[in-house]
């Protein structure tokens, strides 16, 4: 069974991945607008 510490670390990793995906989408959007 996963511990609370593991859950916190997993949640933090998911947030970081979502932030990276969002940044990449914003960069692609800006490139389409400026290009």
UniProtKB/Swiss-Prot annotation:
It comes from Escherichia coli (strain K12). GO terms for cellular component: membrane. This is Uncharacterized protein YniD. The keyword Membrane applies. Keywords: Membrane, Stress response, Transmembrane, Transmembrane helix. Its main location: membrane. Signal peptide: none annotated. It comes from the Bacteria. The chain crosses the membrane at residues 14-34. Induction: Constitutively expressed (at protein level).
